[in-house]
Amino acid sequence: MKLKSGFLGLLYSRGYFNQCTDLAELDQLMSKECVIAYIGFDCTARSLHIGSLMQIMILRYLQKCGHKPIVLLGNGTTKIGDPSGKDKSRTLLSSSDIQENTLGIRKVLEKFIVCGDGVSDALLVYNAEWLDKLNYIDFLRNIGRHFSVNNMLTFDSVKLRLEREQNLSFLEFNYMLLQAYDFIELNQRYNCLLQIGGSDQWGNIVNGVELGRKLKLPQLFGLTTHLLLTSTGEKMGKTANGAVWLDGEMYSPADYWQYFRNVKDEDVGRFLRLFTELPLTEIEKLENLKGYEINEAKKILATEATRICHGEKIAQDIAYDALKVFECNDHSGLPVFYVCKSEIELGLSVVKLLQVSGMEKSNSSAKRLINDKGCKINDIIILDVNYKLSLQDFCGMSYIKLSCGKKRHLKVVLESNL
C-alpha cells in the first residue's frame, strides 16, 4: 500500500495497522500538517504491561514523525470499567486506588515519550477533569440522544455478553458514550482529530467519530492496531509467573530482557518490527537467520526492547550479564544433572526436577521453596508451582542454571541421547 504520510506508512510497514475510518483522507491530512492524535489508557493497575506496548510505541512514532500525541489517562472512565473483551464486570476501584494507579501509569509512560509544550511533545490529560463535572440530564439531552440503543446492542462488547446470558450492567453500558464524549472534549480543547486504539476498541472509536459528525465538528478519524498475539494465538502480556509489567519495580528489567530473549523463533521478526526502532533492512537480515543463529536476533530484540523501556545502560548491563551466564562458562564449577531432551519436550515440572535432582527431598518441600520465591531458573524467580520446563527455557543453550535460595545451584544439562 502506497501512503503519502510517513507516519501511516511506518504503521503499515511495521505491522501495526489494522483499519481506519477514512484512510485516504487521513493520509492526505497527515502528509501535509501536524495532526494531534490521542490514545487512552484506563487506570486499572499501578502499571501498564506489554499488552499496551504497541500503543506506546505508536506514541513514540507520532513524535518522531512530527505529530503531537495526547495521552488520555482515564481516571474518570476507570470508575465505570470498559466492558470490551471482558466476560464479566470489572471490580470497581476506590478513588484512592485509581489515583495511585494514575500516578504509576504516568511514571511508566514518561519513560517512553517526551512530555512538554513543544510542537510534538506529548500532552498528559485526565478525563476526570470533564467527566466528574458532567450534568447527567444535560449529558443525556445533548449527547445521549445521538446514540441508538439498537446499534449499541450490535457491538461485540455488548452482544457477546448478552448471547452468553452474562450480566452487563447499565454502568458498563454507558462506557461507550463516555469514550465517545472524550473524543469530543479533546477535539474542542486541543483540536485532536485522531483516536488510536487496539482492534477491540473499534466500536468505541467509531462511536466517537460518528458523534463528532452528528455534532457538526471537523472530520474526526479513528485508527486501530492489530490485537497483540503470539504465533501460538495467545494474548501477549502474561506469563506463567504473571503479567510482564513495564514498571521495573513490578517486573525486573532482567526478567523483561529474558522475556523477549525467550520468544519463539516465529515471533522474532514481527516483534523486532513492533517493539524496536531498528531499520527494516536490518530486521529483514535478522529474521532470516536460521538454526542457532536466530538466538543472536533474539538477544538484539531483548536488548533493544529493554533499552526503550528501561534505558541504555540497564539494557547493556543485562545483555553483558547474560553473555557471561550463557557464553562465558561461568558455571563450569557447578554440580551437573542431566535431563533427557524428550522429557523437556513433554514438559518437565520444576517440582519434579527439584526432587529427582536431589535439590529438594520431596514434592512438598519443592512446592514450599517455590511459594517462598526461593527457586530460580537462570536467575529468574519461578512463582508457579505448576510451571513446566520447555526448550524455550534453555534459550538455545545446552543447559540452564537451577537455583535454590542464594547458595545452592545446579547446572541442568540437556542430553538428547540418554
Swiss-Prot record:
Keyword Repressor set for record: no
GO CC field: cytosol
EC number: 6.1.1.1
GO molecular function ontology, one term from the record: tyrosine-tRNA ligase activity
Residues covered by the S4 RNA-binding domain: 348-413
Biological process, per Gene Ontology: tyrosyl-tRNA aminoacylation
Enzyme class: ligase
Localization, UniProt: Cytoplasm
Region forming the signal peptide: none
Residue ranges annotated as motif 'KMSKS' region: 235-239
Keyword Electron transport set for record: no
Motif annotated as 'HIGH' region, chain positions: 43-52
Gene3D superfamilies attached to this UniProt entry: HUPs, RNA-binding S4 domain, Tyrosyl-Transfer RNA Synthetase
SUPFAM superfamilies: Alpha-L RNA-binding motif, Nucleotidylyl transferase
Known role: Catalyzes the attachment of tyrosine to tRNA(Tyr) in a two-step reaction: tyrosine is first activated by ATP to form Tyr-AMP and then transferred to the acceptor end of tRNA(Tyr).
Name this protein carries in UniProt: Tyrosine--tRNA ligase
Organism: Ehrlichia ruminantium (strain Gardel)
